[in-house]
UniProtKB/Swiss-Prot annotation:
UniProt source species: Lactococcus lactis subsp. cremoris (strain MG1363)
Annotated keywords: Cell membrane, Membrane, Transmembrane, Transmembrane helix, Transport
Gene designation per UniProt: panT
Membrane topology field: Multi-pass membrane protein
One MF annotation (Gene Ontology) recorded for this entry: transmembrane transporter activity
Subcellular location: Cell membrane
Protein name: Pantothenic acid transporter PanT
Coiled coil: none
Length: 196
């Protein structure tokens, strides 16, 4: 039991380290990436962690993802930083919005919870693919809905639709990446974990 808990903590720490490295790498790539689609990869450790370690640890990984999003949006100013940090002014205003905290944390925490339960329905590669799809879609749907609900009137609907289109385009790429990598990684990690 103690060995299993220690192993889970070690795996959790590895996932967090991967998330930090991926975020740093992504920030570099975004600056030189010539295409408008800039998908995130931070959902992958959260989804895979949820499947492998359970929904509680998945929720914790989602919280870490939210914290990374919040800190990055607070430090690195981009046109969409206000969506994830109340310390960045909303476009067209001189103040931030507390809803940035909601968008930064709640969708990400739920991405850490839902894949575990989806995977339990079909405990195989198909289940891993469905869990990856569900986790990625959860983030996309909640972020888009939040943009429209919390910022639609402030941004005027045309700008919120533009932001929505950007997020939706990114999410298609994110879903494809998540499904491919999760279906490849989860069986290998599950086997390695069961053998240890």
């Amino acid at each position: 039991m103690k060995k299993s808990k220690a192993s889970d903590v070690a795996i959790l720490a590895i996932f967090i380290a991967i998330m930090v490295v991926v975020q740093l790498f992504t920030q570099f790539v975004i600056n030189v990436w010539p295409f408008p689609v800039k998908p995130t990869l931070l959902h992958l450790p959260v989804i895979i962690g949820s499947i492998i370690l359970g929904w509680r640890k998945g929720a914790f990984l989602g919280l870490v993802w939210g914290l990374i999003s919040f800190v990055t949006a607070t430090i690195v100013t981009t046109p969409t930083s206000f969506l994830f940090s109340p310390f960045q002014p909303v476009i067209g205003t001189h103040h931030g919005s507390p809803w940035g905290l909601f968008i930064a944390f709640i969708p990400r925490i739920l991405v850490g919870i839902l894949p575990y339960f989806v995977y339990k329905i079909a405990n195989n590669r198909l289940g891993a693919g469905l869990a990856a799809f569900a986790g990625t879609a959860t983030n996309t749907v909640l972020v888009l809905t939040s943009i429209f609900l919390f910022f639609g009137s402030t941004l005027k609907w045309s700008l919120s639709y533009l932001l929505g289109a950007i997020v939706a385009t990114n999410s298609l790429t994110e879903v494809i990446i998540a499904v491919i990598l999760t279906t490849a990684i989860v069986p290998a990690l599950t086997k390695a974990r069961n053998n240890s």
